[in-house]
Amino acid sequence: DPMLAITARRGMVLNLTDKATAAIVIKCSNGWDAQNILDLANPLADFGLNKDDYSKLEIKNAEKYGCETAGIGLAKVARLLPAALIAHIADNDASVLDSWATRHGLLVVDAGDVFQYEHTQARTLKAVSEAKVPLLDANDTRIIAFRPFDGGLEHLAIVIGEENLKKDQPVLARLHSECFTGDLLASLKCDCGDQLRSAINEIALAGGGVLLYLAQEGRGIGLVNKLRAYELQDSGLDTIDANEQLGFDADERIYLPAAEMLRQLGFEKIRLMTNNPDKINSLAACGLNVVERVA
């Protein structure tokens, strides 16, 4: 029988679990259609399943590194809702599975590769192009584009006042997660655009530094899901609660890409412009020396 895998975060929102497990799996009952499944996965769906029926659902915890959790991981990579419809195949022989998948036009992915995907992307980042791009508040600017081996998400290093930077001295740095609505459209829902331009100006006034523009829209959930979260916020939820309603953690970002970019640029000591201690701790865990927090 097919099963629906959702994050434990989404399960707790639905009162289907009170445990901080990796994910939960729900058996799809006879007579269910796509709408019933969507009701459980998407808080914005029209509920066709009576909440009184939740107590009748057959639920189990998913293994932390099992295929159900990997299915959710694939959905996150694709910037979809963090849920997956799972069907087990009886034969576990790899050659048989490959043959079966080929006949049905399906892709075979190893669960381990899914769990390591974000780290693999970060570890394989390479600078692929660069150009001098004078900015309004920082005329001496070079932008370097980094891309992982699979051609996935691109991150940008905006290096300002390069001639003043010394590799043996701490570099003034800012990590900025991309925000289409704030950076480009001046959305009133956030101050990301103001933060971006202020950071560029401050780095230029300080003589130089680097701003990393990271492809982590919506705290790592992607633009489509961020718009879903905005719709939930319009009903009274804050940013964190809205993300959790969708089944995401409060913050899905990792900062290994930032650490790898700084390392490749030759900067091991950082004066980090942030009010977020998670960024400091994450860079330190990646082997960089954050010598100062600049508020």
Question: Each predicted region: which residue ranges?
Answer:
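Catalytic domains of riboflavin
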Residues: D1-A295
